[in-house]
Amino acid sequence: SSFFNWWYFGICMGILTALLILNYIQDNLGWVLGFGLPCISMGFALGLLLLGTRIYRHQAPDDKCLSVRIAQVLVDALRNRLLCLFSPAGEVREPLLPRNAQFKFSDEKKAVIIVESHLSSPPLQVQAVDAASAMEEANGMVLLLPIWAACLIYAVVFAQPPTFFTKQGSTLERHIGEDFQIPPAALQGFISVTIVLFIPVYDRVLVPAGRRATGNPSGITMLQRIGIGMFLSVVSMAVAALVEMRRLRTARELGLVDAPGVALPMSLWWLVPQYVIFGVSEALTMVGLQEFFYDQVPDGLRSVGLALYMSIFGIGSLLSSFLISTIDRVTVGRGESWFSDNLNRAHLDYFYWLLAGFSVGGLVVYLYFAQSYLYKKT
Protein backbone atom coordinates (compact mmCIF):
# COMPACT_ATOMS: atom_id res chain seq x y z
CA SER A 1 0.00 0.00 0.00
CA SER A 2 2.79 2.41 0.91
CA PHE A 3 4.56 1.64 -2.37
CA PHE A 4 1.54 2.63 -4.45
CA ASN A 5 1.11 5.81 -2.40
CA TRP A 6 4.64 7.00 -3.10
CA TRP A 7 4.61 5.78 -6.69
CA TYR A 8 1.58 7.98 -7.40
CA PHE A 9 3.19 10.77 -5.38
CA GLY A 10 6.12 10.71 -7.83
CA ILE A 11 3.79 10.84 -10.84
CA CYS A 12 1.97 13.86 -9.42
CA MET A 13 5.25 15.63 -8.71
CA GLY A 14 6.07 15.30 -12.41
CA ILE A 15 2.62 16.55 -13.41
CA LEU A 16 2.93 19.49 -11.03
CA THR A 17 6.29 20.45 -12.51
CA ALA A 18 4.81 20.38 -16.00
CA LEU A 19 1.78 22.45 -15.03
CA LEU A 20 3.62 25.12 -13.08
CA ILE A 21 6.81 25.45 -15.13
CA LEU A 22 6.26 24.13 -18.65
CA ASN A 23 2.91 25.88 -19.12
CA TYR A 24 4.51 29.18 -18.19
CA ILE A 25 7.45 28.54 -20.55
CA GLN A 26 5.15 27.63 -23.44
CA ASP A 27 2.94 30.70 -22.91
CA ASN A 28 5.74 33.21 -22.37
CA LEU A 29 9.03 31.87 -23.79
CA GLY A 30 7.90 29.84 -26.78
CA TRP A 31 6.88 26.36 -27.82
CA VAL A 32 10.34 25.30 -29.00
CA LEU A 33 11.73 25.52 -25.48
CA GLY A 34 8.44 24.24 -24.06
CA PHE A 35 8.71 21.00 -26.04
CA GLY A 36 12.51 20.81 -25.95
CA LEU A 37 12.75 20.55 -22.17
CA PRO A 38 10.36 17.55 -21.92
CA CYS A 39 12.30 15.87 -24.74
CA ILE A 40 15.57 16.29 -22.84
CA SER A 41 13.92 15.07 -19.63
CA MET A 42 12.59 11.93 -21.33
CA GLY A 43 16.02 11.21 -22.80
CA PHE A 44 17.55 11.47 -19.33
CA ALA A 45 14.84 9.20 -17.86
CA LEU A 46 15.39 6.62 -20.63
CA GLY A 47 19.11 6.63 -19.87
CA LEU A 48 18.43 5.93 -16.18
CA LEU A 49 16.09 3.08 -17.14
CA LEU A 50 18.68 1.46 -19.39
CA LEU A 51 21.41 1.76 -16.76
CA GLY A 52 19.43 -0.51 -14.48
CA THR A 53 18.65 -3.27 -16.98
CA ARG A 54 21.35 -5.59 -15.59
CA ILE A 55 19.99 -5.54 -12.06
CA TYR A 56 16.26 -5.84 -12.79
CA ARG A 57 14.67 -9.11 -11.72
CA HIS A 58 12.74 -11.01 -14.35
CA GLN A 59 10.87 -14.19 -13.52
CA ALA A 60 10.37 -16.50 -16.48
CA PRO A 61 6.74 -17.65 -16.97
CA ASP A 62 5.63 -21.22 -16.45
CA ASP A 63 5.59 -23.67 -19.32
CA LYS A 64 1.97 -22.83 -19.95
CA CYS A 65 0.75 -19.27 -19.51
CA LEU A 66 -1.75 -18.89 -16.67
CA SER A 67 -4.21 -17.08 -18.88
CA VAL A 68 -4.11 -20.00 -21.35
CA ARG A 69 -4.71 -22.49 -18.53
CA ILE A 70 -7.66 -20.48 -17.28
CA ALA A 71 -9.14 -20.28 -20.78
CA GLN A 72 -8.78 -24.04 -21.27
CA VAL A 73 -10.37 -24.75 -17.92
CA LEU A 74 -13.32 -22.47 -18.69
CA VAL A 75 -13.90 -24.21 -22.01
CA ASP A 76 -13.84 -27.63 -20.34
CA ALA A 77 -16.03 -26.37 -17.50
CA LEU A 78 -18.69 -25.06 -19.85
CA ARG A 79 -18.59 -28.32 -21.80
CA ASN A 80 -19.28 -30.30 -18.64
CA ARG A 81 -21.46 -27.74 -16.83
CA LEU A 82 -24.28 -30.19 -16.12
CA LEU A 83 -22.13 -32.87 -14.51
CA CYS A 84 -20.82 -33.25 -10.98
CA LEU A 85 -17.44 -34.41 -9.78
CA PHE A 86 -17.24 -37.16 -7.16
CA SER A 87 -14.29 -38.57 -5.31
CA PRO A 88 -13.54 -42.35 -5.47
CA ALA A 89 -15.34 -42.76 -2.14
CA GLY A 90 -18.45 -41.14 -3.55
CA GLU A 91 -18.09 -37.93 -1.63
CA VAL A 92 -18.64 -34.61 -3.34
CA ARG A 93 -15.38 -32.78 -3.84
CA GLU A 94 -15.07 -29.51 -1.92
CA PRO A 95 -13.71 -26.33 -3.50
CA LEU A 96 -10.00 -25.73 -2.94
CA LEU A 97 -10.38 -22.10 -1.90
CA PRO A 98 -13.09 -20.78 0.45
CA ARG A 99 -13.68 -17.58 -1.54
CA ASN A 100 -15.79 -19.46 -4.10
CA ALA A 101 -18.63 -19.68 -1.62
CA GLN A 102 -19.30 -16.24 -3.07
CA PHE A 103 -19.25 -17.56 -6.61
CA LYS A 104 -22.40 -19.63 -7.11
CA PHE A 105 -21.42 -20.88 -10.56
CA SER A 106 -18.62 -22.92 -9.00
CA ASP A 107 -20.42 -23.72 -5.76
CA GLU A 108 -23.21 -25.58 -7.52
CA LYS A 109 -20.64 -27.92 -9.12
CA LYS A 110 -21.96 -27.06 -12.60
CA ALA A 111 -18.61 -25.78 -13.80
CA VAL A 112 -16.09 -28.45 -12.95
CA ILE A 113 -13.45 -30.51 -14.69
CA ILE A 114 -14.29 -34.20 -14.98
CA VAL A 115 -11.62 -36.55 -13.65
CA GLU A 116 -12.72 -40.19 -13.69
CA SER A 117 -12.18 -42.06 -10.43
CA HIS A 118 -10.15 -44.83 -12.09
CA LEU A 119 -7.68 -42.27 -13.49
CA SER A 120 -5.78 -41.91 -10.24
CA SER A 121 -2.18 -42.00 -11.38
CA PRO A 122 -0.01 -39.17 -10.04
CA PRO A 123 0.20 -37.23 -13.35
CA LEU A 124 -3.58 -37.12 -13.65
CA GLN A 125 -4.00 -36.19 -10.00
CA VAL A 126 -1.65 -33.27 -10.52
CA GLN A 127 -3.56 -32.31 -13.64
CA ALA A 128 -6.83 -32.35 -11.69
CA VAL A 129 -5.39 -30.13 -8.98
CA ASP A 130 -4.00 -27.73 -11.58
CA ALA A 131 -7.38 -27.59 -13.32
CA ALA A 132 -9.21 -26.90 -10.08
CA SER A 133 -6.66 -24.25 -9.16
CA ALA A 134 -7.08 -22.60 -12.55
CA MET A 135 -10.85 -22.63 -12.07
CA GLU A 136 -10.44 -20.88 -8.73
CA GLU A 137 -8.22 -18.28 -10.40
CA ALA A 138 -10.79 -17.79 -13.18
CA ASN A 139 -13.52 -17.31 -10.58
CA GLY A 140 -11.36 -14.73 -8.84
CA MET A 141 -10.98 -12.77 -12.08
CA VAL A 142 -14.73 -12.81 -12.68
CA LEU A 143 -15.37 -11.49 -9.16
CA LEU A 144 -13.37 -8.38 -10.03
CA LEU A 145 -15.68 -7.42 -12.89
CA PRO A 146 -18.57 -5.93 -10.82
CA ILE A 147 -16.09 -3.67 -9.00
CA TRP A 148 -14.56 -2.73 -12.35
CA ALA A 149 -17.96 -1.85 -13.84
CA ALA A 150 -19.09 0.13 -10.78
CA CYS A 151 -16.00 2.36 -11.04
CA LEU A 152 -16.69 3.44 -14.63
CA ILE A 153 -18.80 6.43 -13.57
CA TYR A 154 -15.90 7.65 -11.45
CA ALA A 155 -13.77 7.59 -14.60
CA VAL A 156 -16.38 9.76 -16.35
CA VAL A 157 -16.06 12.32 -13.55
CA PHE A 158 -12.27 11.98 -13.69
CA ALA A 159 -12.32 13.23 -17.30
CA GLN A 160 -13.90 16.60 -16.39
CA PRO A 161 -11.20 18.59 -14.50
CA PRO A 162 -8.76 18.78 -17.46
CA THR A 163 -11.57 20.01 -19.72
CA PHE A 164 -14.52 21.85 -18.22
CA PHE A 165 -12.82 22.89 -14.98
CA THR A 166 -10.11 24.51 -17.10
CA LYS A 167 -12.72 26.15 -19.34
CA GLN A 168 -14.42 27.60 -16.27
CA GLY A 169 -11.13 29.02 -15.04
CA SER A 170 -10.42 30.70 -18.38
CA THR A 171 -13.44 33.00 -17.86
CA LEU A 172 -12.40 34.21 -14.38
CA GLU A 173 -9.95 36.78 -13.07
CA ARG A 174 -6.60 34.96 -12.88
CA HIS A 175 -4.14 37.76 -12.08
CA ILE A 176 -1.82 37.49 -9.10
CA GLY A 177 -0.40 40.95 -8.57
CA GLU A 178 -0.37 43.39 -11.47
CA ASP A 179 1.67 41.52 -14.06
CA PHE A 180 1.42 37.77 -13.49
CA GLN A 181 -1.57 35.86 -14.88
CA ILE A 182 -2.03 32.16 -14.18
CA PRO A 183 -2.49 30.16 -17.42
CA PRO A 184 -5.83 28.30 -17.42
CA ALA A 185 -4.14 24.90 -17.83
CA ALA A 186 -2.00 25.57 -14.74
CA LEU A 187 -5.15 25.49 -12.61
CA GLN A 188 -4.84 21.70 -12.79
CA GLY A 189 -1.88 22.18 -10.49
CA PHE A 190 -4.29 22.59 -7.59
CA ILE A 191 -5.16 18.89 -7.93
CA SER A 192 -1.51 17.83 -8.05
CA VAL A 193 -0.59 20.10 -5.12
CA THR A 194 -3.41 18.57 -3.10
CA ILE A 195 -2.24 15.03 -3.89
CA VAL A 196 1.41 15.85 -3.16
CA LEU A 197 0.43 17.31 0.23
CA PHE A 198 -2.21 14.70 1.09
CA ILE A 199 -0.34 11.46 0.33
CA PRO A 200 2.45 11.98 2.92
CA VAL A 201 -0.16 12.88 5.55
CA TYR A 202 -2.24 9.84 4.62
CA ASP A 203 0.72 7.44 4.56
CA ARG A 204 2.49 8.70 7.71
CA VAL A 205 -0.40 9.90 9.88
CA LEU A 206 -3.78 8.52 8.82
CA VAL A 207 -2.65 4.96 8.02
CA PRO A 208 -0.91 4.41 11.41
CA ALA A 209 -3.93 5.87 13.20
CA GLY A 210 -6.28 3.64 11.23
CA ARG A 211 -4.02 0.63 11.86
CA ARG A 212 -4.33 1.13 15.61
CA ALA A 213 -8.11 1.50 15.35
CA THR A 214 -8.89 -1.35 12.95
CA GLY A 215 -5.92 -3.70 13.10
CA ASN A 216 -5.67 -3.58 9.30
CA PRO A 217 -2.05 -3.07 8.15
CA SER A 218 -3.27 -0.45 5.65
CA GLY A 219 -5.53 1.30 8.14
CA ILE A 220 -8.62 0.68 6.03
CA THR A 221 -9.29 -1.89 3.33
CA MET A 222 -8.63 -1.18 -0.33
CA LEU A 223 -12.35 -1.14 -1.15
CA GLN A 224 -13.09 1.24 1.72
CA ARG A 225 -10.42 3.59 0.42
CA ILE A 226 -11.88 3.49 -3.08
CA GLY A 227 -15.40 4.06 -1.74
CA ILE A 228 -14.38 7.14 0.25
CA GLY A 229 -12.71 8.55 -2.86
CA MET A 230 -15.84 7.93 -4.94
CA PHE A 231 -17.97 9.71 -2.34
CA LEU A 232 -15.65 12.73 -2.47
CA SER A 233 -16.01 12.81 -6.26
CA VAL A 234 -19.76 13.30 -5.72
CA VAL A 235 -19.00 16.20 -3.35
CA SER A 236 -16.59 17.68 -5.89
CA MET A 237 -19.21 17.65 -8.65
CA ALA A 238 -21.80 19.24 -6.35
CA VAL A 239 -19.37 22.01 -5.37
CA ALA A 240 -18.46 22.56 -9.03
CA ALA A 241 -22.15 22.92 -9.89
CA LEU A 242 -22.69 25.50 -7.14
CA VAL A 243 -19.65 27.52 -8.25
CA GLU A 244 -20.83 27.44 -11.86
CA MET A 245 -24.26 28.69 -10.80
CA ARG A 246 -22.53 31.61 -9.06
CA ARG A 247 -20.40 32.30 -12.15
CA LEU A 248 -23.44 32.38 -14.46
CA ARG A 249 -25.31 34.65 -12.06
CA THR A 250 -22.34 37.05 -12.01
CA ALA A 251 -22.29 37.16 -15.83
CA ARG A 252 -26.02 37.94 -15.95
CA GLU A 253 -25.92 40.59 -13.25
CA LEU A 254 -23.06 42.47 -14.95
CA GLY A 255 -24.47 42.15 -18.46
CA LEU A 256 -21.50 40.07 -19.68
CA VAL A 257 -23.44 37.09 -20.99
CA ASP A 258 -22.62 37.95 -24.60
CA ALA A 259 -19.04 39.02 -23.86
CA PRO A 260 -17.26 35.66 -23.48
CA GLY A 261 -13.86 37.24 -24.08
CA VAL A 262 -14.15 39.47 -21.02
CA ALA A 263 -12.92 37.99 -17.75
CA LEU A 264 -15.60 38.04 -15.09
CA PRO A 265 -14.79 39.98 -11.90
CA MET A 266 -14.81 36.71 -9.99
CA SER A 267 -11.58 35.32 -8.56
CA LEU A 268 -10.17 31.97 -9.66
CA TRP A 269 -10.00 31.07 -5.96
CA TRP A 270 -13.69 30.17 -6.21
CA LEU A 271 -12.56 27.07 -8.11
CA VAL A 272 -10.04 25.92 -5.51
CA PRO A 273 -12.52 23.91 -3.33
CA GLN A 274 -13.64 21.69 -6.21
CA TYR A 275 -10.03 21.12 -7.26
CA VAL A 276 -8.91 20.30 -3.70
CA ILE A 277 -11.79 17.92 -3.00
CA PHE A 278 -11.20 16.16 -6.29
CA GLY A 279 -7.47 15.95 -5.52
CA VAL A 280 -8.16 14.09 -2.27
CA SER A 281 -10.66 11.90 -4.12
CA GLU A 282 -8.06 11.07 -6.76
CA ALA A 283 -5.38 10.24 -4.17
CA LEU A 284 -7.73 7.77 -2.50
CA THR A 285 -9.45 6.22 -5.51
CA MET A 286 -6.62 6.04 -8.04
CA VAL A 287 -4.10 4.53 -5.63
CA GLY A 288 -6.75 2.24 -4.18
CA LEU A 289 -7.70 0.92 -7.61
CA GLN A 290 -4.07 0.35 -8.56
CA GLU A 291 -3.43 -1.63 -5.40
CA PHE A 292 -6.71 -3.54 -5.60
CA PHE A 293 -6.36 -4.78 -9.17
CA TYR A 294 -2.68 -5.59 -8.66
CA ASP A 295 -3.22 -7.47 -5.41
CA GLN A 296 -6.44 -9.37 -6.12
CA VAL A 297 -5.56 -11.02 -9.44
CA PRO A 298 -3.60 -14.31 -9.54
CA ASP A 299 0.15 -13.78 -9.37
CA GLY A 300 0.59 -14.82 -12.99
CA LEU A 301 -1.93 -12.22 -14.19
CA ARG A 302 -0.61 -9.09 -12.48
CA SER A 303 -0.24 -7.33 -15.82
CA VAL A 304 -3.88 -8.15 -16.60
CA GLY A 305 -4.89 -6.62 -13.28
CA LEU A 306 -3.15 -3.35 -14.08
CA ALA A 307 -4.68 -3.47 -17.56
CA LEU A 308 -8.12 -3.73 -15.95
CA TYR A 309 -7.30 -0.69 -13.83
CA MET A 310 -6.18 1.35 -16.84
CA SER A 311 -9.16 0.22 -18.92
CA ILE A 312 -11.52 1.81 -16.38
CA PHE A 313 -10.23 5.26 -17.31
CA GLY A 314 -9.94 4.54 -21.02
CA ILE A 315 -13.55 3.38 -21.25
CA GLY A 316 -14.63 6.13 -18.84
CA SER A 317 -13.14 8.75 -21.14
CA LEU A 318 -15.05 7.27 -24.09
CA LEU A 319 -18.26 7.24 -22.05
CA SER A 320 -17.67 10.88 -21.11
CA SER A 321 -17.30 11.85 -24.77
CA PHE A 322 -20.42 9.87 -25.70
CA LEU A 323 -22.43 11.45 -22.86
CA ILE A 324 -21.34 14.98 -23.78
CA SER A 325 -22.07 14.53 -27.48
CA THR A 326 -25.48 13.01 -26.72
CA ILE A 327 -26.45 15.80 -24.31
CA ASP A 328 -25.21 18.43 -26.75
CA ARG A 329 -27.24 16.94 -29.60
CA VAL A 330 -30.39 16.84 -27.46
CA THR A 331 -30.03 20.32 -25.94
CA VAL A 332 -29.07 21.99 -29.24
CA GLY A 333 -32.35 20.73 -30.64
CA ARG A 334 -34.14 22.57 -27.85
CA GLY A 335 -32.38 25.82 -28.68
CA GLU A 336 -29.76 26.10 -25.92
CA SER A 337 -26.81 23.73 -25.67
CA TRP A 338 -25.36 22.88 -22.28
CA PHE A 339 -21.94 23.10 -23.93
CA SER A 340 -22.20 26.32 -25.93
CA ASP A 341 -18.94 27.88 -27.17
CA ASN A 342 -20.01 30.90 -25.15
CA LEU A 343 -19.68 29.45 -21.66
CA ASN A 344 -21.85 32.25 -20.26
CA ARG A 345 -24.79 30.80 -22.21
CA ALA A 346 -23.93 27.18 -21.48
CA HIS A 347 -25.16 25.12 -18.55
CA LEU A 348 -22.22 23.29 -17.09
CA ASP A 349 -24.04 23.48 -13.78
CA TYR A 350 -26.73 21.14 -15.13
CA PHE A 351 -24.04 18.78 -16.41
CA TYR A 352 -22.24 18.74 -13.06
CA TRP A 353 -25.47 18.01 -11.22
CA LEU A 354 -26.16 15.17 -13.67
CA LEU A 355 -22.71 13.70 -13.03
CA ALA A 356 -23.24 14.03 -9.29
CA GLY A 357 -26.48 12.05 -9.63
CA PHE A 358 -24.83 9.38 -11.77
CA SER A 359 -21.99 9.19 -9.24
CA VAL A 360 -24.43 8.59 -6.40
CA GLY A 361 -25.95 5.73 -8.38
CA GLY A 362 -22.52 4.33 -9.18
CA LEU A 363 -21.53 4.57 -5.52
CA VAL A 364 -24.63 2.64 -4.44
CA VAL A 365 -23.84 -0.13 -6.94
CA TYR A 366 -20.21 -0.14 -5.83
CA LEU A 367 -21.15 -0.45 -2.15
CA TYR A 368 -23.48 -3.34 -2.95
CA PHE A 369 -20.69 -5.39 -4.53
CA ALA A 370 -17.89 -4.17 -2.25
CA GLN A 371 -19.62 -5.18 0.99
CA SER A 372 -19.93 -8.79 -0.21
CA TYR A 373 -16.48 -9.07 -1.80
CA LEU A 374 -14.12 -11.65 -0.26
CA TYR A 375 -10.45 -10.76 -0.55
CA LYS A 376 -8.00 -13.24 -2.02
CA LYS A 377 -6.15 -15.13 0.69
CA THR A 378 -2.39 -14.60 0.67
Question: What do these predicted ranges mean?
Answer:
Residues 1-378:
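Hydrophobic transmembrane alpha-helices of multi-pass solute transporters/permeases
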